[in-house]
Amino acid sequence: MYIDITHYLTVSALMFTIGIAGIFLNRKNVIIILMSIELILLSVNLNFVAFSAFLHDLVGQIFALFVLTVAAAEAAIGLAILVVFFRNRGSIAVEDVNVMKG
């Protein structure tokens, strides 16, 4: 069986849909929202790599590496902010994020 570009695009669209659904269906847990954003970025990277392989061009794969680098930095900074927020407030609920001390 030959796996062509439609299989990759179908998996990518499914991953993107699951990521969007994770954001909209669970608005209370910040960690799940961050994981959903990472899933969306991973599906975009799969699109870049699939089109890059289909068109025999390396630009999509190089761009996917840049997106992975930015996603890793975003995850590290987001988790660091969550750790500091949890130490100060004792909770990571989204409802507690908008309550700020002046």
Curated annotation (Swiss-Prot):
It is a multi-pass membrane protein. The chain crosses the membrane at residues 5-25, 31-51, 66-86. This is NADH-quinone oxidoreductase subunit K. NDH-1 shuttles electrons from NADH, via FMN and iron-sulfur (Fe-S) centers, to quinones in the respiratory chain. The immediate electron acceptor for the enzyme in this species is believed to be ubiquinone. Couples the redox reaction to proton translocation (for every two electrons transferred, four hydrogen ions are translocated across the cytoplasmic membrane), and thus conserves the redox energy in a proton gradient. Belongs to the complex I subunit 4L family. It catalyses: a quinone + NADH + 5 H(+)(in) = a quinol + NAD(+) + 4 H(+)(out). Gene3D superfamilies: 1.10.287.3510. GO terms for molecular function: NADH:ubiquinone reductase (non-electrogenic) activity; quinone binding. One of its GO terms (biological process) is ATP synthesis coupled electron transport. Its EC number is 7.1.1.-. GO terms for cellular component: NADH dehydrogenase complex; plasma membrane. It comes from Bartonella grahamii (strain as4aup). HAMAP family: NDH1_NuoK. NDH-1 is composed of 14 different subunits. Subunits NuoA, H, J, K, L, M, N constitute the membrane sector of the complex. It holds the Pfam family Oxidored_q2. It is found in: Cell inner membrane. The gene is nuoK. Keywords: Cell inner membrane, Cell membrane, Membrane, NAD, Quinone, Translocase, Transmembrane, Transmembrane helix, Transport, Ubiquinone. It comes from the Bacteria. Coiled coil: none annotated. The keyword NAD applies. PANTHER family: NADH DEHYDROGENASE SUBUNIT 4L-RELATED, NADH-UBIQUINONE OXIDOREDUCTASE SUBUNIT ND4L.
